[in-house]
Amino acid sequence: MSSIRVGIVGASGYSGEELIRLLVRHPGVDLRWITSRQYKDRTLQSVYPGIGRFGELEFDDLESLEKKENQLELVFLALPHGAGMDYAHFFYNRGKVVIDLSADFRLENPLDYELYYKLSHPHADLLKKAVYALPEIYPDQIAHSNLLAMPGCYPTAVLLSLAPFLKKGWIDPHSIEIVALSGSTGAGKTLDTKLLFSELADNLRPYSFPSHRHIPEMEQQIAKLVKTDSVKVIFLPILAPLRRGILLTVIGSLSQPISQAEAEEQAQEFYKEAPFVKILPGGIMPELRYVLYSNNLYFSIHVLEEKKKLLILAAIDNLGKGAAGQAIQVMNIRLGWAQTLGLIP
């Protein structure tokens, strides 16, 4: 098969590292450019021994941007929120496919971005051109866009868990409550006392409640799924003593009586062509070990008929389906390749 020339901007963060791990085994990728100020001029194999393909490729810095852009067809941006906006604008305006793993182009309203991320968006005109790149929900839009905004890790799990039932009108979209346990890599490579081993071990720490940054993203997309102006969700994230992985519970009020069998059948039908979404049957519940180092999402459905509630348990790897793995799935869709290429051995 023909290959595409790829660059990674921000290749030394956790998402960037995961992108490298996955892309070196992707048969359609010719990795041409990786950036990291920390590792500048070092080879890929000197930083990640045993990496295999592209081991002699050297980390570069962004000062070489103008020289390198002609060598690239597709660019992953794996920078912290706010740091990659100008690079997205630069590459997009030069006809490159841009896949941005940050939150910079997820929110349609620049005022929401300013409120939750404390930054004024310098390229707000691009927000209308960006596609929210959740593969199982928006594959057609992904296939025709050059600016692809990757969903956050929590919203990925929440939206994929709820979508089959929201689209049917079975859940009141204003009743949704979420509690999630997450590993520490979700915070990035931040120098923060709260992320030290001795602070994480033997501990669970709720954080960013009640106004986590992923809330407007969830609310925006839930409103789109049910075709209403706005919804409000309650979201409690909890930092767990784990490197990676998310296990979450979603609860919503049923808007009509449904059976357990109907709920499972609806989910199976909704995701019948989704290779990475796995619905667990018969009361089996997801565990983190099912999803680590994969692009899979596992979830179980529990209809609480007497309480008129639907409870969903879901598990993903925040660096896999929550970040780098899903970004490669999106690349595959955009290029007309099988979604699973490079993601399933």
Swiss-Prot record:
Q: Which InterPro entries match?
A: AGPR_AS, AGPR_type-1, NAD(P)-bd_dom_sf, NAGSA_dehydrogenase, Semialdehyde_DH_NAD-bd
| EC number in record | 1.2.1.38
Q: List the subcellular locations.
A: Cytoplasm
Query: Keywords of this protein's UniProt record, alphabetized?
Result: Amino-acid biosynthesis, Arginine biosynthesis, Cytoplasm, NADP, Oxidoreductase
Reactions that this protein is recorded to catalyse: N-acetyl-L-glutamate 5-semialdehyde + phosphate + NADP(+) = N-acetyl-L-glutamyl 5-phosphate + NADPH + H(+)
Q: Which Pfam families match?
A: Semialdhyde_dh, Semialdhyde_dhC_1
Q: Which family does it belong to?
A: Belongs to the NAGSA dehydrogenase family. Type 1 subfamily.
The name this protein goes by in its record = N-acetyl-gamma-glutamyl-phosphate reductase
